[in-house]
Amino acid sequence: VFYIVEQDSKLESLERLAKLGLYVDVISSNDLYHPKLSSTIAVYIRPVNSKHGFIIPINHDEGLNIPKDRIYGILSSASKLYTVNKKDLLYHFNLQEAIDISLLYSMVKYDRLEYSRENNTLNHFYNKFRDFPNINQLIPISKLYESCEKVYDQVKQVIEYEIPSGFDFYNKTATNVFFLLEQSGIGIHYEAFKKMFTPRNPLFNTVDNTVLTSYNLYNVTSRPTNAFNSVNFAAIPKSPEHRKCFRPTGDYFVELDFDGYHLRLLSEQIDYRLSSDSAHEQLAKIYFNKEEINEDEYKEAKQTNFHAIYGKIPEKWAFLEIFTKIDSYVRELWGRYENDGEILAPISGKPFGRGLKDMNPQKLINYVMQSLETSRNILILKEALRFLKDKKTKLVLYTY
C-alpha cells in the first residue's frame, strides 16, 4: 500500500525529502496513557506541502517493523521538523530542534490549537478496549494513518506562521524543563490516592506507587497547567486527607516558596530596592509606622500590596516611591502596547500583542508578571535539575 513505508528504497526517498521540512506525529501504544508508560507503535511523517503523508510501522502486526534509530535518522535530518506536541515527542525521540506547532499557535493566536484524531474505527476500539495498554496495535494501520492525516489537515496552516519573539525559550528551554520534571513522578499511597482523587483509570499514569503528571504549556501567560487523568496536580487540595495520599520516594518532601514573589519581581523591574527581609513586612512597617508588625497587620499589608500590583493603588499610599514607580511602569507598558501593538515580556521575550482580547493596563501588567514569574522559574528549575542530575533528591512538582 502506497502510504506504508517499509523498504529501504522508500526510506531513502523520505530521507531525501527531509530537506524540504517534515511534519511528524508519533502513534503511541495507547493515546490515554501517560507517554512515559507508552511505547512507539508507528510514526506518521509528512513532507511539508506534500499531498499525503507516510506511515512507518515500528511495532505493529501489519507492517515489516522498522528500527527506531533508522526513523530517528530521517527525522533528525529534516531542515525543519514540526509536531503537534514536542514534549510528548521527546518521550519517543530526542529531537531538540522540533518545532511545537501547538505552542506556536498559542503564542500567535493567544488560544489553544484544537484538533481531533477520531474516526469511526478508533472510536469503536477505544469504546471497547480503552484500558488495554497496546490498543493501537489492534487498530488497522490504515485507520491510524487516516487519523494522522486528519490531524495534519486541521493544523497544517500553523506551519506557515512566522516564529514569534520568545518562541525558542518556550520551545526548547521550557519544554525540556517540564519534560525532565515529569520523569520523577510523585510517590503515592495507591489506595488512598485512588479514593481521594478518583482518577479516570489509575493505570493511565501510575506505576510502582508513583503517579505521573503532565504539564500543559499552551496558555496565554505561559503559566503551565498540570492536569492528567482527571486529576489537577496544580491545585491539590490542602486538606490533611488529600495531602496524606502522597509519600516521598526518598526520605522527605521539601516545599520551597518565594517571599513576596510578585512584589519582588516587580520591584526589580521598577528599580525599587527591597532588602532580604520579608517584602510584605517591609511595606507594612511603612503603612503602620512601626517596627513590630502583628499577624493582622501583615495580612492587611499583603492585601494592599496585591491590590496595588493588580488592581488600583490605594490613594492613601499613592505618594510612596514604590507605588509612583509601579504606576509609571504600568503606564509605560500600556503606552508601548497602544503605540507599538505589542510589548515583550522580560526574560523570555514573549510578545503580548493586539490579538489579546479586552485588554487594559491592569490586565497587561497581570500577564507580564505571570510570564515573568514563569520564565524566571523555568531558569531556576533548569539550574536545579542540572544540579540534582547525579543526586538522589528529585524535583517532583511545580505549582504557583
Which role does the model predict for each range below?
Residues 1-119:
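Conserved RNase H-like, two-metal-ion catalytic cores of nucleic-acid enzymes
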Residues 32-40, 45-51, 58-63, 190-295, ...:
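Acidic, glycine-rich two-metal-ion catalytic cores of nucleic acid-processing enzymes
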Residues 90-163, 174-184, 229, 235-361:
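Helical catalytic core of nucleic-acid polymerases
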Residues 100, 172, 192, 300-302, ...:
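Short Gly/Ser/Thr- and Asp/Glu-enriched loop/turn motifs at secondary-structure junctions
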Residues 144-147, 173, 373-376, 380:
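Helical mechanochemical/support elements of P-loop NTPase systems and associated helical scaffolds
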Residues 167-176, 196:
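Acidic two-metal-ion nuclease catalytic site recognized across multiple nuclease folds
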Residues 169, 181, 185-190:
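Non-catalytic, peripheral interaction segments enriched in hydrophobic/basic residues
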